[in-house]
């Protein structure tokens, strides 16, 4: 059995009680407009979304909500997110939620293209193995994750499931 592989995770993880406030320092480094990717803006998480929006607005970062993420995300959902990012000319993507949100937000950031179209055949060939390093493409957007669950660890890896 071959136990040889590469694992690349350029992730900075800020963990601990009260650390959400640091979003005010981190986010502006990536621009002044973000696409906040989430589940529908309802229920108990709505308070978190409002808090994140208030934090970002306090440092002059505009928030564009994309709240169409469903469990087990679909290609169609990712396409809608990319279109929202392009239409609103965002500078970075912020995922707030659990694994499905993180996976969707990562793919929206990765597959972002000014024309809004996604070449799925090329994407699935280029990004088909989580242990291979593939350089970011020209239009990839920065990605920030605010995890609200402790399940999949999607906020820490380069892999995404759709």
Language-model features and meaning:
Residues 76-162:
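Glycine/threonine-rich beta-strand-loop-alpha-helix active-site module
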